[in-house]
Protein backbone atom coordinates (compact mmCIF):
# COMPACT_ATOMS: atom_id res chain seq x y z
CA UNK A 1 0.00 0.00 0.00
CA UNK A 2 1.29 3.44 -0.87
CA UNK A 3 2.06 6.13 1.71
CA UNK A 4 2.47 6.10 5.45
CA UNK A 5 0.28 3.49 7.15
CA UNK A 6 1.81 3.77 10.65
CA UNK A 7 -1.33 5.35 12.08
CA UNK A 8 -3.63 2.45 11.23
CA UNK A 9 -3.61 -1.06 12.63
CA UNK A 10 -3.18 -4.02 10.27
CA UNK A 11 -6.55 -5.46 11.32
CA UNK A 12 -9.21 -2.77 11.22
CA UNK A 13 -12.35 -2.50 13.33
CA UNK A 14 -14.89 -1.42 10.73
CA UNK A 15 -18.28 0.02 11.70
CA UNK A 16 -20.94 0.37 9.02
CA UNK A 17 -23.67 2.79 10.08
CA UNK A 18 -27.28 2.37 9.00
CA UNK A 19 -30.73 3.78 9.69
CA UNK A 20 -32.76 2.55 12.66
CA UNK A 21 -34.57 -0.70 11.94
CA UNK A 22 -32.20 -1.87 9.22
CA UNK A 23 -29.41 -3.40 11.34
CA UNK A 24 -30.39 -6.99 10.53
CA UNK A 25 -30.87 -6.07 6.88
CA UNK A 26 -27.34 -4.65 6.70
CA UNK A 27 -25.97 -7.76 8.42
CA UNK A 28 -27.67 -9.94 5.79
CA UNK A 29 -26.21 -7.79 3.02
CA UNK A 30 -22.71 -8.13 4.49
CA UNK A 31 -23.11 -11.91 4.62
CA UNK A 32 -24.03 -11.90 0.93
CA UNK A 33 -20.97 -9.74 0.21
CA UNK A 34 -18.68 -12.23 1.96
CA UNK A 35 -18.60 -10.95 5.56
CA UNK A 36 -20.45 -13.58 7.66
CA UNK A 37 -19.11 -12.54 11.08
CA UNK A 38 -20.82 -9.18 11.49
CA UNK A 39 -21.87 -7.92 14.92
CA UNK A 40 -25.05 -5.87 15.26
CA UNK A 41 -24.83 -2.57 17.18
CA UNK A 42 -27.31 0.30 17.59
CA UNK A 43 -27.90 1.67 14.08
CA UNK A 44 -24.70 -0.02 12.94
CA UNK A 45 -22.99 -3.31 12.16
CA UNK A 46 -19.35 -4.05 12.96
CA UNK A 47 -16.79 -6.31 11.27
CA UNK A 48 -13.01 -6.70 11.13
CA UNK A 49 -11.05 -6.32 7.92
CA UNK A 50 -8.39 -4.56 5.89
CA UNK A 51 -8.25 -1.52 3.62
CA UNK A 52 -9.27 -3.56 0.59
CA UNK A 53 -12.52 -4.22 2.46
CA UNK A 54 -13.00 -0.49 3.11
CA UNK A 55 -12.71 0.26 -0.61
CA UNK A 56 -14.93 -2.66 -1.58
CA UNK A 57 -17.68 -1.92 0.94
CA UNK A 58 -17.85 1.82 0.22
CA UNK A 59 -18.56 0.86 -3.37
CA UNK A 60 -20.76 -2.21 -2.89
CA UNK A 61 -22.74 -1.77 0.34
CA UNK A 62 -26.20 -0.48 -0.54
CA UNK A 63 -27.54 -0.35 3.02
CA UNK A 64 -24.73 1.61 4.74
CA UNK A 65 -24.86 5.34 5.47
CA UNK A 66 -21.14 5.57 6.20
CA UNK A 67 -18.18 3.32 6.98
CA UNK A 68 -15.93 4.09 9.95
CA UNK A 69 -12.49 2.78 10.95
CA UNK A 70 -11.67 2.90 14.65
CA UNK A 71 -8.34 4.57 15.47
CA UNK A 72 -8.56 4.94 19.26
CA UNK A 73 -10.57 3.68 22.21
CA UNK A 74 -10.09 4.75 25.84
CA UNK A 75 -11.86 5.68 29.08
CA UNK A 76 -12.10 9.16 30.63
CA UNK A 77 -13.07 10.60 34.00
CA UNK A 78 -12.87 14.33 33.25
CA UNK A 79 -13.24 16.65 30.28
CA UNK A 80 -9.50 17.24 30.23
CA UNK A 81 -8.88 13.49 29.92
CA UNK A 82 -10.43 13.60 26.46
CA UNK A 83 -8.06 16.34 25.30
CA UNK A 84 -5.02 14.62 26.82
CA UNK A 85 -5.78 11.26 25.19
CA UNK A 86 -6.61 12.83 21.81
CA UNK A 87 -3.40 14.90 21.98
CA UNK A 88 -1.34 11.70 22.27
CA UNK A 89 -2.56 10.47 18.89
CA UNK A 90 -0.33 10.83 15.82
CA UNK A 91 -2.82 12.70 13.69
CA UNK A 92 -0.21 13.58 11.08
CA UNK A 93 0.16 9.87 10.29
CA UNK A 94 -3.46 9.79 9.11
CA UNK A 95 -3.70 12.91 6.95
CA UNK A 96 -1.63 15.89 5.78
CA UNK A 97 -1.82 19.38 7.24
CA UNK A 98 -3.19 20.74 3.95
CA UNK A 99 -6.41 18.70 4.28
CA UNK A 100 -9.51 20.26 5.80
CA UNK A 101 -11.20 18.38 8.63
CA UNK A 102 -14.18 18.31 10.96
CA UNK A 103 -15.12 16.41 14.12
CA UNK A 104 -18.67 15.07 14.44
CA UNK A 105 -20.37 12.17 16.18
CA UNK A 106 -22.56 11.45 19.20
CA UNK A 107 -22.14 12.21 22.93
CA UNK A 108 -24.02 10.29 25.64
CA UNK A 109 -22.10 11.16 28.80
CA UNK A 110 -22.50 13.10 32.04
CA UNK A 111 -18.79 13.93 31.97
CA UNK A 112 -19.63 16.89 29.73
CA UNK A 113 -22.04 19.66 30.67
CA UNK A 114 -22.10 20.88 27.07
CA UNK A 115 -22.34 18.18 24.40
CA UNK A 116 -20.62 20.44 21.85
CA UNK A 117 -17.53 20.77 24.02
CA UNK A 118 -16.04 17.28 23.35
CA UNK A 119 -15.80 18.06 19.63
CA UNK A 120 -13.92 21.28 20.40
CA UNK A 121 -11.49 19.39 22.64
CA UNK A 122 -10.65 16.84 19.94
CA UNK A 123 -10.42 19.59 17.33
CA UNK A 124 -7.95 21.48 19.54
CA UNK A 125 -5.91 18.32 20.11
CA UNK A 126 -5.65 17.75 16.36
CA UNK A 127 -4.67 21.36 15.63
CA UNK A 128 -2.11 21.40 18.46
CA UNK A 129 -0.55 18.16 17.22
CA UNK A 130 -0.07 19.49 13.70
CA UNK A 131 1.26 22.80 14.98
CA UNK A 132 3.85 20.96 17.11
CA UNK A 133 4.87 18.54 14.33
CA UNK A 134 4.69 20.73 11.22
CA UNK A 135 4.57 24.32 12.46
CA UNK A 136 1.30 24.71 10.60
CA UNK A 137 -2.34 23.85 11.27
CA UNK A 138 -5.08 22.25 9.14
CA UNK A 139 -8.21 24.25 8.37
CA UNK A 140 -11.61 23.28 9.73
CA UNK A 141 -14.42 22.83 7.21
CA UNK A 142 -17.79 21.90 8.70
CA UNK A 143 -19.91 21.36 5.58
CA UNK A 144 -17.61 19.44 3.23
CA UNK A 145 -14.42 18.42 5.07
CA UNK A 146 -11.84 16.30 3.29
CA UNK A 147 -11.28 14.33 6.50
CA UNK A 148 -14.15 13.60 8.88
CA UNK A 149 -13.33 12.44 12.42
CA UNK A 150 -16.09 10.56 14.24
CA UNK A 151 -16.23 10.98 18.03
CA UNK A 152 -18.47 8.65 20.05
CA UNK A 153 -18.69 9.00 23.84
CA UNK A 154 -20.86 6.64 25.90
CA UNK A 155 -20.59 7.38 29.63
CA UNK A 156 -16.82 7.10 30.26
CA UNK A 157 -15.96 5.18 27.09
CA UNK A 158 -14.58 7.09 24.10
CA UNK A 159 -14.20 5.76 20.57
CA UNK A 160 -12.53 7.86 17.88
CA UNK A 161 -12.82 6.79 14.25
CA UNK A 162 -12.21 8.15 10.79
CA UNK A 163 -15.19 8.27 8.46
CA UNK A 164 -13.89 6.66 5.26
CA UNK A 165 -16.99 7.62 3.27
CA UNK A 166 -17.15 11.34 3.95
CA UNK A 167 -20.50 12.51 2.64
CA UNK A 168 -23.25 9.97 3.45
CA UNK A 169 -23.40 7.02 1.05
CA UNK A 170 -26.99 7.83 0.12
CA UNK A 171 -25.45 10.58 -1.98
CA UNK A 172 -25.04 8.04 -4.77
CA UNK A 173 -24.16 10.44 -7.55
CA UNK A 174 -26.87 9.30 -9.96
CA UNK A 175 -29.77 11.51 -8.88
CA UNK A 176 -30.10 14.47 -11.23
CA UNK A 177 -33.59 15.45 -10.09
CA UNK A 178 -35.36 14.74 -6.79
CA UNK A 179 -39.05 14.77 -6.01
CA UNK A 180 -40.92 16.88 -3.46
CA UNK A 181 -40.63 14.21 -0.75
CA UNK A 182 -37.96 11.83 -2.02
CA UNK A 183 -37.17 8.54 -0.35
CA UNK A 184 -33.58 8.23 0.83
CA UNK A 185 -31.48 6.01 -1.45
CA UNK A 186 -30.05 3.91 1.40
CA UNK A 187 -33.57 3.51 2.84
CA UNK A 188 -34.82 2.45 -0.60
CA UNK A 189 -32.09 -0.17 -0.99
CA UNK A 190 -32.67 -1.43 2.56
CA UNK A 191 -36.43 -1.71 2.04
CA UNK A 192 -35.94 -3.69 -1.16
CA UNK A 193 -33.70 -6.16 0.65
CA UNK A 194 -36.03 -6.31 3.68
CA UNK A 195 -39.04 -6.90 1.43
CA UNK A 196 -37.76 -10.28 0.22
CA UNK A 197 -38.05 -9.43 -3.48
CA UNK A 198 -36.49 -12.29 -5.48
CA UNK A 199 -35.00 -9.97 -8.16
CA UNK A 200 -36.91 -11.92 -10.83
CA UNK A 201 -40.57 -11.03 -10.29
CA UNK A 202 -41.86 -7.86 -11.99
CA UNK A 203 -41.15 -4.86 -9.75
CA UNK A 204 -43.66 -2.02 -9.80
CA UNK A 205 -43.90 1.38 -8.08
CA UNK A 206 -47.24 3.13 -8.82
CA UNK A 207 -46.11 6.29 -6.97
CA UNK A 208 -42.59 6.33 -8.38
CA UNK A 209 -41.76 10.03 -7.90
CA UNK A 210 -38.20 10.58 -9.12
CA UNK A 211 -37.62 6.83 -9.46
CA UNK A 212 -35.39 5.99 -6.49
CA UNK A 213 -37.04 2.66 -5.59
CA UNK A 214 -37.03 1.58 -9.24
CA UNK A 215 -33.38 2.53 -9.73
CA UNK A 216 -32.22 0.82 -6.53
CA UNK A 217 -34.22 -2.26 -7.52
CA UNK A 218 -32.65 -2.34 -10.98
CA UNK A 219 -29.16 -1.87 -9.53
CA UNK A 220 -29.71 -4.80 -7.17
CA UNK A 221 -31.16 -7.03 -9.90
CA UNK A 222 -28.27 -6.34 -12.28
CA UNK A 223 -25.58 -6.53 -9.59
CA UNK A 224 -24.32 -3.04 -10.37
CA UNK A 225 -23.02 -1.31 -7.20
CA UNK A 226 -25.31 1.52 -6.09
CA UNK A 227 -22.30 3.81 -5.59
CA UNK A 228 -20.76 3.22 -9.02
CA UNK A 229 -21.52 6.84 -10.04
CA UNK A 230 -20.19 8.37 -6.81
CA UNK A 231 -16.89 10.25 -7.10
CA UNK A 232 -16.17 11.51 -3.56
CA UNK A 233 -14.83 9.21 -0.84
CA UNK A 234 -12.99 10.55 2.20
CA UNK A 235 -10.48 7.68 2.16
CA UNK A 236 -8.91 9.28 -0.92
CA UNK A 237 -7.68 12.06 1.40
CA UNK A 238 -5.84 9.77 3.81
CA UNK A 239 -2.06 9.42 3.72
CA UNK A 240 -2.33 5.70 3.14
CA UNK A 241 -4.65 5.95 0.12
CA UNK A 242 -3.70 3.17 -2.29
CA UNK A 243 -4.78 4.45 -5.69
CA UNK A 244 -3.78 1.24 -7.45
CA UNK A 245 -5.89 -0.90 -5.11
CA UNK A 246 -8.85 1.48 -5.40
CA UNK A 247 -8.66 1.55 -9.20
CA UNK A 248 -8.55 -2.24 -9.26
CA UNK A 249 -11.61 -2.44 -6.98
CA UNK A 250 -13.51 0.14 -9.02
CA UNK A 251 -12.61 -1.34 -12.41
CA UNK A 252 -13.74 -4.78 -11.27
CA UNK A 253 -17.14 -3.26 -10.46
CA UNK A 254 -17.28 -1.60 -13.88
CA UNK A 255 -16.93 -5.02 -15.51
CA UNK A 256 -20.23 -6.16 -14.02
CA UNK A 257 -22.44 -6.46 -17.08
CA UNK A 258 -25.74 -8.21 -16.45
CA UNK A 259 -28.98 -7.66 -18.29
CA UNK A 260 -32.10 -6.76 -16.33
CA UNK A 261 -33.65 -10.13 -15.36
CA UNK A 262 -37.18 -8.81 -14.84
CA UNK A 263 -39.64 -6.12 -15.80
CA UNK A 264 -39.49 -2.90 -13.79
CA UNK A 265 -42.49 -0.59 -14.07
CA UNK A 266 -43.20 2.81 -12.62
CA UNK A 267 -45.98 5.35 -12.84
CA UNK A 268 -46.81 8.71 -11.33
CA UNK A 269 -49.70 11.09 -11.76
CA UNK A 270 -47.23 13.97 -12.21
CA UNK A 271 -45.71 14.54 -15.65
CA UNK A 272 -42.88 16.42 -13.94
CA UNK A 273 -42.03 13.44 -11.69
CA UNK A 274 -42.05 11.05 -14.64
CA UNK A 275 -39.64 13.34 -16.48
CA UNK A 276 -37.37 13.40 -13.42
CA UNK A 277 -37.44 9.60 -13.22
CA UNK A 278 -36.43 9.30 -16.84
CA UNK A 279 -33.59 11.79 -16.38
CA UNK A 280 -32.28 9.86 -13.38
CA UNK A 281 -32.39 6.60 -15.36
CA UNK A 282 -30.46 7.91 -18.36
CA UNK A 283 -27.00 7.18 -16.99
CA UNK A 284 -27.61 3.45 -16.60
CA UNK A 285 -27.39 0.66 -19.16
CA UNK A 286 -30.76 -0.65 -17.94
CA UNK A 287 -32.40 2.79 -18.10
CA UNK A 288 -34.23 2.24 -21.37
CA UNK A 289 -35.71 -1.03 -20.11
CA UNK A 290 -37.42 0.55 -17.10
CA UNK A 291 -40.94 1.55 -18.18
CA UNK A 292 -42.28 4.80 -16.70
CA UNK A 293 -45.75 6.18 -17.45
CA UNK A 294 -47.51 9.42 -16.48
CA UNK A 295 -50.68 7.88 -15.05
CA UNK A 296 -52.45 7.58 -11.71
CA UNK A 297 -51.88 4.22 -10.02
CA UNK A 298 -55.33 2.86 -10.95
CA UNK A 299 -54.74 3.51 -14.65
CA UNK A 300 -51.21 2.12 -14.81
CA UNK A 301 -50.64 -0.93 -16.98
CA UNK A 302 -50.92 -4.06 -14.85
CA UNK A 303 -48.30 -6.67 -15.71
CA UNK A 304 -49.20 -10.24 -16.55
CA UNK A 305 -48.31 -12.80 -13.91
CA UNK A 306 -46.96 -12.16 -10.40
CA UNK A 307 -46.02 -8.62 -9.44
CA UNK A 308 -44.03 -7.17 -6.55
CA UNK A 309 -45.25 -3.68 -5.64
CA UNK A 310 -42.89 -1.50 -3.62
CA UNK A 311 -43.98 2.07 -3.03
CA UNK A 312 -43.81 5.22 -0.94
CA UNK A 313 -47.26 6.83 -1.38
CA UNK A 314 -47.78 10.52 -0.58
CA UNK A 315 -48.12 11.16 3.15
CA UNK A 316 -48.12 13.96 5.71
CA UNK A 317 -45.45 16.28 7.11
CA UNK A 318 -44.12 17.14 3.66
CA UNK A 319 -47.23 16.40 1.60
CA UNK A 320 -50.87 16.83 2.54
CA UNK A 321 -52.26 13.58 3.88
CA UNK A 322 -55.03 12.14 1.72
CA UNK A 323 -56.68 9.16 3.42
CA UNK A 324 -59.00 8.78 0.45
CA UNK A 325 -55.96 8.09 -1.73
CA UNK A 326 -54.82 5.28 0.57
CA UNK A 327 -58.32 3.79 0.64
CA UNK A 328 -58.50 3.84 -3.17
CA UNK A 329 -55.00 2.36 -3.37
CA UNK A 330 -55.99 -0.46 -1.00
CA UNK A 331 -59.11 -1.18 -3.05
CA UNK A 332 -57.02 -1.30 -6.24
CA UNK A 333 -54.55 -3.72 -4.65
CA UNK A 334 -57.40 -5.87 -3.36
CA UNK A 335 -59.40 -6.10 -6.56
CA UNK A 336 -56.88 -5.67 -9.37
CA UNK A 337 -53.69 -7.40 -8.20
CA UNK A 338 -54.54 -11.11 -8.14
CA UNK A 339 -51.07 -12.52 -7.58
CA UNK A 340 -48.33 -10.64 -5.83
CA UNK A 341 -46.94 -8.75 -2.87
CA UNK A 342 -47.29 -5.10 -1.89
CA UNK A 343 -44.70 -3.38 0.32
CA UNK A 344 -45.60 0.09 1.54
CA UNK A 345 -43.61 2.63 3.56
CA UNK A 346 -45.43 5.60 5.08
CA UNK A 347 -45.33 7.88 8.09
CA UNK A 348 -49.13 8.10 8.07
CA UNK A 349 -50.67 5.58 10.48
CA UNK A 350 -54.17 6.69 9.47
CA UNK A 351 -53.30 6.36 5.81
CA UNK A 352 -52.00 2.82 6.28
CA UNK A 353 -55.16 1.87 8.18
CA UNK A 354 -57.18 3.20 5.25
CA UNK A 355 -55.54 0.67 2.92
CA UNK A 356 -57.86 -1.91 4.51
CA UNK A 357 -55.69 -5.00 4.12
CA UNK A 358 -54.08 -7.30 6.67
CA UNK A 359 -50.31 -7.01 6.66
CA UNK A 360 -48.07 -10.06 6.99
CA UNK A 361 -45.16 -8.00 8.32
CA UNK A 362 -44.79 -4.63 10.04
CA UNK A 363 -41.48 -2.93 10.83
CA UNK A 364 -40.72 0.49 12.32
CA UNK A 365 -38.16 2.30 10.16
CA UNK A 366 -37.00 5.82 9.37
CA UNK A 367 -36.89 7.64 6.05
CA UNK A 368 -34.28 10.23 6.94
CA UNK A 369 -35.73 11.78 10.12
CA UNK A 370 -39.30 10.67 9.40
CA UNK A 371 -40.70 7.97 11.70
CA UNK A 372 -42.30 5.46 9.33
CA UNK A 373 -43.93 2.06 9.19
CA UNK A 374 -43.02 -0.50 6.52
CA UNK A 375 -45.78 -3.03 5.85
CA UNK A 376 -45.90 -6.07 3.62
CA UNK A 377 -49.17 -7.43 2.20
CA UNK A 378 -49.73 -10.74 0.41
CA UNK A 379 -52.11 -10.36 -2.53
CA UNK A 380 -54.04 -13.19 -4.17
CA UNK A 381 -57.38 -14.01 -5.78
CA UNK A 382 -59.26 -14.41 -2.51
CA UNK A 383 -57.75 -11.42 -0.76
CA UNK A 384 -60.91 -9.35 -0.91
CA UNK A 385 -62.59 -11.84 1.46
CA UNK A 386 -59.92 -11.07 4.07
CA UNK A 387 -60.15 -7.30 3.75
CA UNK A 388 -60.71 -5.22 6.81
CA UNK A 389 -63.77 -3.06 6.40
Question: Which residue stretches match the model-derived regions?
Answer:
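Short, charged/polar, Gly/Pro-enriched secondary-structure boundary elements
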Residues: 52-59, 167-170, 383-385
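SAM-dependent Rossmann-like transferase core, predominantly class I methyltransferases
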Residues: 160-194
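Non-catalytic nucleic-acid substrate-recognition regions in nucleic-acid-modifying enzymes
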Residues: 2-145, 389
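C-terminal edge-of-domain segments
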Residues: 149-165, 375, 384
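Conserved S-adenosyl-L-methionine
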Residues: 183-302, 323
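C-terminal catalytic and target-recognition region of SAM-dependent MTase-like enzymes
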Residues: 295-389
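A short, flexible beta-alpha/helix-coil linker loop
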Residues: 108-111, 168, 314-318
